[in-house]
Amino acid sequence: MITEDFYKKRMLQYYTDEEAFRIVYSFLEDKAKEAKSQGDKKKEQAYLEVRILFLKRNIKIRKEMDQLKAQYEYQKKRE
């Protein structure tokens, strides 16, 4: 059973993670552009690869968040 307190704390954590993701993703994008303008292909590739890893992590977090939200809403309907 998902308590309302747990649900609220977990959703807050998801939203905090989402905000952190946006900051890091933007930073990595800027660094990749900077490396490209300097002609450093290896650095650009490294920044892009890390950015992709963060994107995959964010997708996983969003799926977990959606699943928790669906479970909580279903539980509320049954009560």
What is the predicted role of each segment?
Residues I2-E34, Q71:
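N-terminal acidic leader/helix
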Residues S26-Y74:
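Short, charge-rich amphipathic interface segments used for partner binding and complex assembly
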